[in-house]
């Protein structure tokens, strides 16, 4: 598991988010659009930065991402 504070990794879900999103055959833009329908505004570029772990993720974004991808929240952390 990535260290929580290491100067580079700003979240713990990036790699899993990318894997789960691709498994769902969803583009970053698709994910962004679906999040927007829930009132959570995360642009495609921000999703890219989340996936490469260079951007933090809010708790609201986490719950919305799990909802859009139809996964349990803990799956994003495994």
Where are the model-predicted features located?
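Short basic helix-loop element that most often maps to the first helix and adjoining turn
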Residues: 15-36
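Helix-turn-helix DNA-binding elements, focusing on the entry/boundary residues of the two helices
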Residues: 17, 28, 44, 59-62
